[in-house]
Every structure is written in structure tokens, then in C-alpha cells.
């Protein structure tokens, strides 16, 4: 089989610009004409269900898998099929079996996946889908999460729902999103605790992140001096806690009466160990505001739509405890990340985050 030839076409493979020099099969189990494998591609580990040609067929043939590669952690059995794939742009593969959602993680890293870790500790929060179980395997003495199951909650993708309101108002939905985000943050703070670090430490991390982005997109270098000045203006102690880490409209589901936050793995480009560190909850707030701004730039959407939605989200989240200076810092950080992404992937879109960068720096 030629995994190297096919994996470069998969959305979950994030190293498309790198030449594949080595593919090592770490674990495998055959199921008729397909094989479930953990394959180390260069330095990263991926879970695949491949045919004889090395092409991944997990979404189409998952019913063939009776038990996976790992140990199942749950009071109940692994859900039986038939499975219906949830289509969409995902870095993992999610399927539905009755009232259960099964998520196969694709890029496998050491440690309990934060999607499992966080959600299993806040099952009573009404704005998340409770975890039912997960499967993991031990490699080199460390646990690696392979699969998780959650209660399936039907809903509409938050991004798609937002775009259906472009000729009207998204304000009430945004307010509900703010309330949902605050509810999840409070639940995580209660369960995992809070801490604080000097503002200088936060600034150092943001500057290091910016320098990494400049390596990816040298065009950002002209904004470095001004951005560093904004970061260095932070003073005092910054409150930290466990957060979502990659919150945007597409990481939410709109049900009949509320919003559900999904995919708590954090920013995919960051190492898993880094994604599990406490961070400011305003990083999540900034991520959602940036997502609203993107939606506000689509055809038919008016500037007023975005402004009203932003205000409503902050009202729902609770502005009494919100540090506007710190929020602006995280908006700048997110927008700089978006500029680097758009330069390398969708240059026609770079004006959207670039406007946000200039607005904060002005």
C-alpha cells in the first residue's frame, strides 16, 4: 500500500508542504479488504482505515470495524452501526449511530485528548454534548486517544446558520452564543480551577507566536514593532483557566433552544501539550468575534450586522468582568494568525483579518 501517495489529499493531513520521507506502521488490524492502522508519517502519527492501495476509507467503510486498536473506556459497549458520516470540513472523522456520535481522531498525539478530558468533566453543562466513552492505546509508555463517543445532539452548523441571517439580524443568536460561552467557561473554571501569570509572561508568549507567524508569512514583519508595543502595554496579572482554544462559529451547533460548543481539541496547529495549558478565556471570546467579523464580510451582509452581533455577544458573555485591553490583544493575536493563514491559503481573503490588525494597531 502507498499511504504516502494518498494521505496528502486528506484534510486531516496538515503537512502538505513537506515531502514525505518515511512511513512507519506502528499498529495495524485487518478487517477483510481494509486495514485499520496507526501510521507514523515523517514525525506525526495518523489513524487510517486503508484499502490495498493505501487510500483512507474510514468514512465509507467504518461499519466493518468491530473493535478498534485500543482499549475501550466506558460503562457501556462501543456503539454498533450502521453509521452515518457527518459530512463537512473536519480534521477528524465523525459518524452517527442512533443517538450517539462517534469521533475517530486522525492525528494522534501523546496524552488524553482535550476533547475527552474537558467534556468528560463538565457533563452537566447544558452547552456541551456529554462524553459517553473513549478508546486509547499505550505507545512508548504514554496514552494516546483514538476514538471518543458523545451524545448526538442534532443542530445546524453555527457558521451556516449565521450566514442565513445576513439580510436580517444575528444579534439574538450572538447573545445566546455569548451566554453559552460564558456558561462553558464557568464550568471549566469550577472543574479545573484557575491561576494567574504576570502580563509580561503572556506578552512574551504572544511575541514568540508572532515571530513564528512571520516565518510563515514574512509580510507580517511590518506589523511586528507596533504589535509588540501593544503586547508590552499589558500590566498586572492575567487570569488563566482551561478554555475551548479554537472557538469560532463553525465550532458551534444551533439547536431549537440553545447553542452547543463542540470540538474542544484546541487550535490544530499547536502541539497537544501546549493546547492543554491554561489560557485566558478572552482568547475564546476573541476567536468568536473574529468569526463574526468574517461572516460580516460575506455578500449581502452589512457592517451593521457585524457590529450588532459583536455587541450582543459581549452582552451575553457579560461585559462587567471583561478587560477590553486584553480582549484587543487577543483579537490582534488571532487576526495576525488569520493573515498568515490567508496569505498561504486564500490570498483573496487576506483583507478581512488585515483590517482587524490595522484597527487594533491604530
Label every model-predicted segment:
Residues 30-211, 257-258, 272-298:
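Conserved ATP-binding subdomain of kinase catalytic cores across diverse folds
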Residues 1-27:
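Short Lys/Arg-enriched alpha/beta "domain-start" segment
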Residues 242, 261-263:
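Pre-DFG segment of protein kinase catalytic domains
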Residues 259, 266-318, 332-349:
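Active-site activation/catalytic loop segments of kinase-like enzymes and analogous catalytic loops
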Residues 251-261:
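Conserved protein kinase catalytic/activation segment
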Residues 194-232, 309, 340:
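Active-site catalytic-loop/activation-segment of kinase and kinase-like phosphoryl-transfer enzymes
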Residues 242-245, 249:
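Catalytic-loop of the protein kinase fold
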Residues 187, 234-241:
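Protein kinase catalytic-loop region centered on the HRD/HxD motif
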Amino acid at each position: 500500500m502507498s499511504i504516502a501517495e494518498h494521505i496528502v489529499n486528506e484534510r486531516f493531513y496538515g503537512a502538505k508542504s513537506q515531502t514525505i520521507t518515511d512511513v512507519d506502521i506502528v499498529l495495524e488490524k485487518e478487517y477483510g479488504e481494509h486495514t485499520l492502522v496507526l501510521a507514523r508519517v515523517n514525525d506525526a502519527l495518523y489513524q487510517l482505515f486503508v484499502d490495498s492501495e493505501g487510500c483512507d476509507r474510514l468514512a465509507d467503510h467504518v461499519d466493518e470495524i468491530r473493535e478498534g486498536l485500543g482499549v475501550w473506556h466506558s460503562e457501556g459497549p462501543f456503539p454498533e452501526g450502521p453509521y452515518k458520516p457527518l459530512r463537512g470540513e473536519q480534521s477528524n472523522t465523525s459518524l452517527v449511530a442512533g443517538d450517539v456520535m462517534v469521533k475517530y481522531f486522525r492525528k494522534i498525539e501523546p496524552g488524553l485528548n482535550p476533547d475527552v478530558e474537558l467534556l468528560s468533566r463538565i457533563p452537566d453543562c447544558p452547552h456541551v454534548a456529554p462524553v459517553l466513552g473513549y478508546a486509547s492505546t499505550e505507545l512508548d509508555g504514554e496514552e494516546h486517544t483514538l476514538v471518543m463517543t458523545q451524545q448526538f445532539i442534532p443542530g445546524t452548523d453555527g457558521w451556516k446558520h449565521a450566514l442565513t441571517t445576513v439580510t436580517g439580524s444575528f444579534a439574538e443568536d450572538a447573545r445566546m452564543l455569548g451566554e453559552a460561552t460564558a456558561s462553558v467557561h464557568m464550568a471549566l473554571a469550577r472543574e479545573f480551577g484557575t491561576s494567574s501569570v504576570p502580563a509580561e509572561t503572556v506578552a512574551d508568549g504572544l511575541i514568540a507566536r508572532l515571530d513564528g507567524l512571520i516565518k510563515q508569512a514574512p509580510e507580517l514583519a511590518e506589523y511586528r514593532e507596533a504589535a509588540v508595543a501593544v503586547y508590552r502595554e499589558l500590566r498586572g496579572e492575567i487570569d488563566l483557566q482551561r478554555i475551548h482554544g479554537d472557538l469560532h462559529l463553525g465550532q458551534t451547533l444551533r439547536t431549537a433552544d440553545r447553542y452547543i460548543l463542540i470540538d474542544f481539541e484546541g487550535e490544530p496547529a499547536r502541539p497537544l501539550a501546549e493546547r492543554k495549558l491554561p489560557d485566558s478565556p478572552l482568547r475564546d471570546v476573541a476567536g468568536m468575534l473574529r468569526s463574526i467579523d468574517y461572516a460580516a464580510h460575506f455578500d449581502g451582509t452589512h457592517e451593521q450586522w457585524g457590529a450588532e452581533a459583536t455587541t450582543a455577544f459581549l452582552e451575553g458573555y457579560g461585559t462587567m468582568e471583561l478587560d477590553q485591553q486584553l480582549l484587543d490583544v487577543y483579537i490582534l493575536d488571532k487576526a495576525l494568525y488569520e493573515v498568515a493563514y490567508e496569505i498561504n491559503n486564500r490570498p483573496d481573503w487576506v483583507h478581512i483579518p488585515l483590517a482587524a490588525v490595522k484597527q487594533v494597531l491604530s
